[in-house]
């Protein structure tokens, strides 16, 4: 028996070496991807006259208003599947015209059947003058449930999703109410749900120009788009794409300009 094990030892050594080589190759590729991504975001920040933040600073301005990576970390099932704590990654600050902007990534590793998978999101934040708290969300029509049956018009996704209905922390803190804004039946009401603590003020702000712009930018804006505590922000899945993120930033700024919103100072 000892001789058998001795004869098999070289084979086991080769197998172990192959496994080690595979892990090293994956690690090397991940490092190359990380470095390439960091370089691309740094080049974007430099081109905008901005800067990439140190890891200690890389936290969303709005983190206390909406927890980053909430879809992946909220609830018992999500917590049990987390292979690492949530972390904040590549984040850049810059000015776009008059506006102070922060774009930052967050991530969490989740356990899957064959190892781990990293989930990412990035958040776009703009500092603005104080506004009535508001959320604007696209309504998603169609689709099917887990049993393949069509979703009805009263399904939560067709009403803008759950997050848009959730009372913001600043409104809840003062015992405020959270209302859906009633718009006349038409293309805008079909595509968007808007909730706020001040429906009258929001209805006045949604001029025909604003409504037309929102319809034109329906897929260019993050959804939901939050207005709260001097910040306008939205979150999208996946990492920052340096080739496309400015289009989303400019879509938000275009909306603020049409609403007559003034720039604000970012939180310290």
Residue ranges and their predicted role:
Residues 1, 20-23, 57, 174:
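Acidic, low-complexity intrinsically disordered regions
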Residues 1-12:
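Feature marks short, highly hydrophobic, charge-poor N-terminal signal-anchor/signal peptide-like helices
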Residues 40-268:
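Charged, low-complexity intrinsically disordered regions
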Residues 12-20:
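Core hydrophobic alpha-helical transmembrane segments of single-pass membrane proteins
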Residues 19-44:
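Transmembrane-cytosolic junction motif
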